């Protein structure tokens, strides 16, 4: 498996895997399939300029996972935040999430970060296992899930 950092000219590749992710796991993201299917080239390019995206692929033609790293507004300068981690269902449990998170961590470290954070929806134990295996630990902070106030998210952190 290889992990690649996407550049602005990879906008079609990002669009393809992101829309696939939304088709497969509609509740996994803070966005919707209808919204992102309507994005134009400029929207995808803007995403690639404003954040760091990585994709995982194996020997086949399709990308098998993705992750995005951002500088969260209001966060410490030495903190980066993981969003949009997704792995194709048939590749889950094979180390793809770990490889993506490790690449995100090494890139964040190279950029001067000392900590990587993320939010996990309560009850998603498979995600919790992947985060723990990648060196993350719950911080104790929780929040209400914006798109569904009946659900909560748990904050995780990994020192780099």
Language-model features: locations:
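Extreme N-terminal starter segment of soluble prokaryotic enzymes
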Residues: 1-3
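Residues that form or flank phosphate/diphosphate-binding pockets in enzymes
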Residues: 77, 95, 126
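Alpha-helical elements of the RecA-like P-loop NTPase motor core of helicases
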Residues: 12, 128-129
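C-terminal "cap" of GNAT-fold acetyltransferases
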Residues: 114-117, 121-128, 134-160
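Active-site acidic-Proline motif in GNAT/NAT acetyltransferases
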Residues: 88-90, 94, 122-123
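Acetyl-CoA-dependent GNAT
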Residues: 8-90, 98-103, 107, 111, ...
């Amino acid at each position: 498996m290889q992990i690649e950092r996407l550049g602005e000219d990879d906008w079609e590749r990002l669009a393809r895997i992101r829309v696939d992710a939304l088709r497969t796991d509609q509740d996994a993201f803070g966005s919707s399939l209808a919204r992102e299917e309507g994005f134009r080239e400029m929207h995808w390019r803007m995403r690639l300029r404003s954040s760091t995206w990585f994709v995982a692929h194996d020997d086949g033609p399709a990308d098998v996972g993705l992750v995005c790293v951002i500088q969260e507004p209001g966060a410490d300068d030495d903190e980066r935040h993981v969003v949009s981690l997704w792995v194709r269902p048939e590749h889950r449990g094979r180390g793809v999430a770990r490889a993506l998170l490790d690449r995100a961590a090494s890139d964040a470290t190279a950029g001067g970060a000392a900590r990587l954070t993320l939010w996990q929806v309560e009850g998603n134990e498979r995600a919790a296992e992947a985060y723990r295996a990648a060196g993350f630990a719950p911080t104790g902070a929780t929040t209400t899930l914006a798109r569904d106030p009946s659900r909560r998210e748990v904050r995780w952190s990994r020192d780099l």
